Amino acid sequence: HHTFSWVGCLFSGNLLTEWGFICRSLKDIQKDLNTYHPQNFSAVPLAIETIYKKIWFTAKKSGREDILKKGLKISNFLMKLGIDRRRKIFSEIINNLGGNLEMIVCGGAYLDEKYEKGMYDFGIQIINGYGITECSPAVTCNRLDAYKPGSVGIPLPCNEIKIKDPDADG
């Protein structure tokens, strides 16, 4: 387990007034989600990538990949109109992930935007953060009220950040 996930679990329990959730292992993640039915949890990118790939693997294996793609097209069209029906359209996916999952706080490594957007499209918000064990471990975190896809967010209130010798990208 990464320390970022542990801190995320502690914060979710304290700040969101819910019990934190940490799965036993990557191979047990779906079983644990269906046992404990968390609304949110903290994870490393590999866990999110694994969940996302399993969703598509299951759809393909069951011959429902085209249905899933059509559902995404409909859902994304509705979202452009300001109508959010993701959790209804993808209720089977949500139910297979414990039934309550709304958000995953992610950190410990880089998460490809493909997986962040993919999970969002199914109705599960990914909140990226950045940290290293030597820094508490959480340094920054994306926020629901100031969410920017592909970003690790802004510094936590207790942190000051300085980028030494920035390049053209920052």
Predicted regions and their residues:
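Conserved AMP-binding/adenylate-forming
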Residues: 41, 79, 85-170
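Short, flexible loop/turn elements at secondary-structure junctions
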Residues: 1-2, 24, 133, 143
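Conserved AMP-binding/adenylation subdomain of ANL enzymes
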Residues: 2-90
